[in-house]
């Protein structure tokens, strides 16, 4: 199961989150949870090709999505253990700047919701963090400083914390 949601019988409608998925065949399963309720339902699905939405699984260095400078990418941190990696490179010494935006997480404005890290690949299977910051639910837009870095391969890592409950994020590098 890639995503699960529950809708209560008294809810007139329930919207799911957007999911970034690789091309392929997917199935939607609708199941009742209560033997006493035999209600009808209507389901509306929207499928749209999008090259700037994160593609799961991008939870490791090896499966990181490629990010092109100046392009805004969107994604979703679904759980506290969800991690999204984006890979980019500097062909010469330069700088990396990442801007991340998200809607206010109501009731969690001062709570750390996400961790944003910029990581340098030093050698095969050897990585080092060059910048890390925590993002609160009320921080709707944050930017890293211009990080002066040597040429090489870099990763932008966005991770949930124990307070994360599925939030849309957008970032530009």
Regions found by a protein language model. Name each.
Residues 6, 55, 78, 89, ...:
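Residue-level detector of conserved, well-ordered beta-strand and adjacent loop positions
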Residues 17, 22-67, 84-87, 108-110, ...:
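C-terminal edge strands of extracellular/lumenal beta-sandwich accessory domains
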Residues 39, 92-96:
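Short tyrosine-centred short linear motifs in exposed loops/low-complexity segments
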Residues 81:
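Surface-exposed ligand/attachment interfaces on beta-rich extracellular proteins
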Residues 96-107:
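Short amphipathic, basic-aromatic surface patches that mediate peripheral association
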């Amino acid at each position: 199961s890639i995503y699960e949601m529950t809708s209560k019988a008294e809810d007139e409608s329930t919207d799911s989150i957007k999911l970034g998925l690789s091309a392929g065949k997917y199935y939607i399963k609708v199941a009742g949870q209560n033997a006493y309720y035999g209600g009808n339902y209507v389901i509306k699905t929207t499928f749209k090709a999008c090259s700037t939405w994160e593609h799961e699984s991008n939870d490791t260095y090896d499966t990181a999505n490629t990010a092109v400078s100046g392009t805004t990418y969107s994604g979703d941190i679904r759980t506290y253990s969800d991690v999204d990696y984006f890979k980019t490179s500097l062909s010469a010494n330069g700088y990396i700047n990442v801007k991340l935006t998200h809607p206010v997480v109501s009731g969690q404005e001062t709570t750390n919701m996400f961790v944003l890290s910029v990581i340098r690949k030093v050698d095969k299977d050897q990585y080092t963090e060059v910048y890390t910051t925590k993002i609160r639910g009320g921080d709707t837009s944050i930017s890293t400083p211009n990080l002066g870095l040597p040429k090489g391969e870099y990763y932008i890592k966005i991770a949930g914390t124990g307070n994360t409950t599925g939030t849309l994020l957008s970032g530009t590098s």
